[in-house]
Amino acid sequence: LAVLKIVADTSFLMIPGLFRVDIFAELNRILQRRYEILVPEPVVKELEYLSRRGTPSERSAARLALSTLDQMKILPSSSESADLTILEVAKKHPDYLVATADYLLQKRLQKLGVNIIRLRQRTHLMLEREIE
């Protein structure tokens, strides 16, 4: 089986700090195969900004997210926008999954037919469609 590629946005990487959900354990549970998490550069910039300028809970969640980046791969991007970068990557790579807790981004990705990993009931992750 090929290694699954998962593009993560800021909202997804903030889940452990905001909702105390272990995203790695959850990804292992729902995917049951090897995966690599890809983080677009603008997402890293958003996390860095939130770690300095967010609300107290955002700051600690962003710091926690930044501390896990060494287990992920950073995707260089020419765009400043995290959402646009994610949409571009998803269009270019239809087999990639996108992990996001952002409802509006989920809607845009659904229109493209992208398989989404999302947070359910603030307690666990869910895969929108089974992986072929």
Regions found by a protein language model. Give the residues of each.
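Nuclease catalytic cores that cleave nucleic-acid phosphodiester bonds
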Residues: 42-132
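Domain-level signal for Mg2+-assisted phosphodiester chemistry and nucleotide/NA-binding surfaces
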Residues: 1-71
